[in-house]
A protein has these predicted regions:
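Short alpha-helix
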Residues: 174-189
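Conserved class I S-adenosyl-L-methionine
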Residues: 1-50, 53-62, 147-172
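Class I SAM-dependent methyltransferase SAM/SAH-binding core
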Residues: 63-110
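A short acidic, Gly/Pro-enriched loop at the edge of an enzyme's catalytic core
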Residues: 113-120
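Conserved Class I S-adenosyl-L-methionine
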Residues: 193-259
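A short, conserved alpha-helix within the catalytic core of class I
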Residues: 128-141
Length: 259
């Protein structure tokens, strides 16, 4: 798979990249992560990176995949995200679940300022969170631990790469297999721990649901091309009465260290 992210190939500006996630928020799903978020949080408690009296800063909280699991087990979670729609989804779910210790913050992490200290700063699938600058900000705000969660393999994105290929663009997500972040953190003297988590995903998805997701994605890129026919041409040969039987093993990476 190509290592060129569509953002890079299409020369999407930083500001448009932020807007992408707000525009795409309705179709953003945690289904491809399976039970990994729960297992990661359990592991962070086992290792002492998280404790019950911990105030947590989550960077890139999205609609609450990790926040909603974290909040009942810690003192508080401050959820930072640049997308107001993502935060609306998060707070709606928190209200439905009776969770009252989540504080939503609509802000861009790269310009965020906070005079507080947190027992743990955790970045969950937040683009660029492993950069030197981002890690330095995380460590400045944490008096306990720092955590990075990222994909190494998400087969849910294979369709997106196939659509780009049909358009003559060689884009993909092969860069997720890189060890650059943990290698750099270790070389700079941190006692970094790295663990991989796999999950088997099995689900039946209507073709039209996947069509709507990809159409939304391409609109968010600012591309007015209607890719619906391309998506259908990819999916329908293997679909069963309009249903795609999705089966895959996905993998995520957990990086953590004490500050």
């Amino acid at each position: 798979m190509s290592n060129t992210h569509p953002f890079v190939g299409e020369k999407i500006s930083y500001e448009k990249g932020l807007q992408f996630w707000d525009d795409f928020s309705e179709h953003y799903s945690n289904r491809q992560q399976g039970d990994i978020p729960c297992r990661i949080i359990d592991r962070l408690f086992e290792t002492g990176m998280l404790t019950e009296d911990c105030n947590v800063l989550e960077i890139g909280s999205g609609p609450g995949t990790y926040s909603l699991e974290l909040a009942p087990r810690v003192r508080s979670v401050r959820c930072l995200d640049s997308s107001p729609r993502m935060l609306m989804r998060l707070m709606s779910k928190a209200s439905e679940s009776g969770i009252g210790n989540i504080v939503p913050v609509e802000a861009d992490w790269n310009s965020y300022e906070d005079g507080s200290e947190y027992g743990c700063c955790i970045a969950t699938l937040c683009p660029g969170s492993g950069s030197r600058e981002s890690v330095a900000r995380m460590e400045k705000l944490s008096n306990g631990s720092c955590v990075l969660v990222s994909w190494t393999c998400n087969h849910g994105d294979d369709l997106n790469a196939q659509v780009w290929k049909a358009l003559g663009k060689d884009y993909g997500y092969g860069f997720r297999g890189s060890t650059e972040v943990q290698d750099r953190l270790s070389s700079e003297g941190r006692d970094v721990k790295v663990e991989l988590f796999q999950t088997d995903i099995e689900m039946d998805i209507p073709v039209e649901e996947l069509v709507a997701k990809e159409v939304s994605s391409f609109k968010a890129y600012g591309n007015n091309m209607d890719v619906s026919d391309i998506v259908r041409s990819i999916l329908e040969p293997d679909a069963d009465d309009g249903i795609v039987h999705f089966r895959a093993t996905n993998e995520m990476k957990l990086i953590y260290w004490a500050v």
